[in-house]
Amino acid sequence: MLLLDNMNHEELHPLRHSLAHLLGATVVKLYPGSKLTIGPSVDNGFYYDIDTSTKITENDLEHIEQEMRSMLKSWSTFSHKEVSADEAREFFKGNEYKTELINELAEKGEKISLYTSGDFTDLC
């Protein structure tokens, strides 16, 4: 069990970012066809912007949380891989939001990293 009260921002950031990835993976599983945009850690938690044709309401949040808890059991590690912009574009083909982000990273000369946990891979 983690004691979050004693963790500082630098310690909480990777945990929150990982949970944002888990949220994205969960929504994609529960609502097929959803397109993930970005999912950062923020000062008071995390979020994930998601384009979905399904209207997700407050009533859906408990089900999403339960599925996140279930999926978390298979998320024991993350693997990291740096890829070229072309490889990233191919991986995220069909997601215009990821393509836009990849293009922005490539234009700035920044590294493009993919992180995988379970069967979910995302930009990071």
Predicted feature locations:
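TRNA-recognition modules of translation machinery and tRNA-sensing kinases, especially anticodon-binding
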Residues: 18
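Structural signature of FAD isoalloxazine-binding scaffolds in flavoprotein oxidoreductases
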Residues: 40-42
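Auxiliary tRNA-acceptor-end handling modules of aminoacyl-tRNA synthetases
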Residues: 1-14, 26, 35-38, 47-124
